Amino acid sequence: AYSYVSEYKRLPVYNFGL
């Protein structure tokens, strides 16, 4: 199943605390 959370977790901005 596709999860938008999985996409955000792979993005650099996620590590910034988004």
From Swiss-Prot:
Disulfide bonds: none annotated. The modification Leucine amide is found at L18. Keywords: Amidation, Neuropeptide, Secreted. GO terms for cellular component: extracellular region. This is Cydiastatin-2. It is found in: Secreted. Belongs to the allatostatin family. The lineage of its organism: Eukaryota, Metazoa, Ecdysozoa, Arthropoda, Hexapoda. GO terms for biological process: neuropeptide signaling pathway. The keyword Repeat does not apply. It comes from Cydia pomonella. Its main location: secreted.
